[in-house]
Amino acid sequence: MVTNITLILTLMTLASVTAQTFQYSRGWTNGKRDGHKRDELRDEVLERILTPCQLDKLKYVLEGKPLNDRLFVPCDYIEEEVNQPKRYKGERNHELFDVFQ
């Protein structure tokens, strides 16, 4: 009987020591993994490596959306299109102007 109790206490002690060692060796604190700083650092590194246009393209592909021509166009061309001012195109509105003149 005494050996059974001793064996149970020894196993419980060994299990609690092993669990505590695992908890502190893996960087766990209060049940949460200490990875928040690493996530922020990873995001900063990605922002330095990839432009917003490239991130949008990567997100588009990872979401499983169908490939289109816009994915294969270099980001420089897309950014130039966005930065250019919108031009007035009067060809479509000739009939409207004729009515008011």
Curated annotation (Swiss-Prot):
Record-linked Pfam families: Corazonin
Residue positions where Asparagine amide is found in the record: N30
Keyword Nuclease: no
Keyword Cell membrane listed: no
Keywords: Amidation, Cleavage on pair of basic residues, Neuropeptide, Pyrrolidone carboxylic acid, Secreted, Signal
UniProt GO BP: neuropeptide signaling pathway; positive regulation of heart contraction
One GO cellular component term noted in the UniProt record for this chain: extracellular region
Source species, domain of life: Eukaryota
Residues bearing the modification Pyrrolidone carboxylic acid: Q20
Residues annotated as signal peptide: 1-19
Family annotation (InterPro entries): Procorazonin (IPR020190)
GO molecular function, one term: corazonin receptor binding
Family: Belongs to the corazonin family.
General function of this protein: Cardioactive peptide. Corazonin is probably involved in the physiological regulation of the heart beat.
Name listed for the protein in its UniProt record: Pro-corazonin
Organism: Bombyx mori
